[in-house]
């Protein structure tokens, strides 16, 4: 007669056989299913972790590159502003140089014109002195040639003044 376990109608041999088969199944599942499944899960976990690390590294590198680009853009703006300031300063210096050269040239032209006017004035004075001397000699020679009355003297002076006016 079969041995009963705890008064139940389950034979002890069946329980032992089921327990042995279950343990063998557990060992086989652990070896062929649980181990590879856990290995795959571990690989997947490591892969996901490495992907997260790579994404974090890429994100950090992208942030760094963005910051570098911002810094380069800022530097470019500063350099552009400096270039503009240098160009303005150079243009201002050129303007001042051109104005100074124009003033100097105007002063030179003015000085030259004043000298030319002075020469022409001196030449005109010299010419007038020669004409006055010549007229004086002519008047004196005519006076000597004839003795003049007051009326003749006035007429002679008017004639000579008229003659000098026509000569001009």
From Swiss-Prot:
It is a single-pass membrane protein. F(1)F(0) ATP synthase produces ATP from ADP in the presence of a proton or sodium gradient. F-type ATPases consist of two structural domains, F(1) containing the extramembraneous catalytic core and F(0) containing the membrane proton channel, linked together by a central stalk and a peripheral stalk. During catalysis, ATP synthesis in the catalytic domain of F(1) is coupled via a rotary mechanism of the central stalk subunits to proton translocation. Component of the F(0) channel, it forms part of the peripheral stalk, linking F(1) to F(0). Keywords: ATP synthesis, Cell membrane, CF(0), Hydrogen ion transport, Ion transport, Membrane, Transmembrane, Transmembrane helix, Transport. PANTHER family: ATP SYNTHASE SUBUNIT B (PTHR33445:SF1), ATP SYNTHASE SUBUNIT B', CHLOROPLASTIC (PTHR33445). One of its GO terms (molecular function) is proton-transporting ATP synthase activity, rotational mechanism. It comes from Bacillus cytotoxicus (strain DSM 22905 / CIP 110041 / 391-98 / NVH 391-98). Belongs to the ATPase B chain family. F-type ATPases have 2 components, F(1) - the catalytic core - and F(0) - the membrane proton channel. F(1) has five subunits: alpha(3), beta(3), gamma(1), delta(1), epsilon(1). F(0) has three main subunits: a(1), b(2) and c(10-14). The alpha and beta chains form an alternating ring which encloses part of the gamma chain. F(1) is attached to F(0) by a central stalk formed by the gamma and epsilon chains, while a peripheral stalk is formed by the delta and b chains. Gene3D superfamilies: 6.10.250.1580. This is ATP synthase subunit b. NCBIfam families: ATP_synt_b. The chain crosses the membrane at residues 9-29. Its main location: membrane. InterPro entries: ATP_synth_B-like_membr_sf (IPR028987), ATP_synth_b/b'su_bac/chlpt (IPR002146), ATP_synth_F0_bsu_bac (IPR005864), ATP_synthase_B_chain (IPR050059). SUPFAM superfamilies: F1F0 ATP synthase subunit B, membrane domain. It is found in: Cell membrane. GO terms for cellular component: plasma membrane; proton-transporting ATP synthase complex.
